[in-house]
């Protein structure tokens, strides 16, 4: 990697970039982590794996709202913060049966992973129906054709609005 390092040092200072960090606790509070130039970023706790869980993010700018779920289950904090947002990017793990087959895991293990620690496509459809985003996107999904179809079918059991399957480098 020597050539890469030398090339970068020709153009950039060796110290790199400074990082400004906002630390916050795990008490479930809502944190305004950034507010500048009309942009407001809020972190809020969502359910993933007790006791650590994860934090979702809500970005607001010029009367537009984007919410990113992080790894989570359906939970009240997500329903509250994503209500009527413009774009909700929410995780949805593959349907348990397909996940078990693709990962060579027992069905019981696959169900725990996809339905206890993560959001199933069916449950993501419930979240979308209850929050009414202008656009919904799911991620954390195998993007194989044999998975996308069943996942969308499960989402459509509860939600008829606009939904996309996220993929790397997707532009919305």
Show where each model-derived region lies:
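Binuclear metal-dependent hydrolase catalytic cores
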Residues: 1-67, 73, 150-172
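Cap/insert and terminal regions of metallo-dependent hydrolase folds
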Residues: 56, 63-65, 73-170
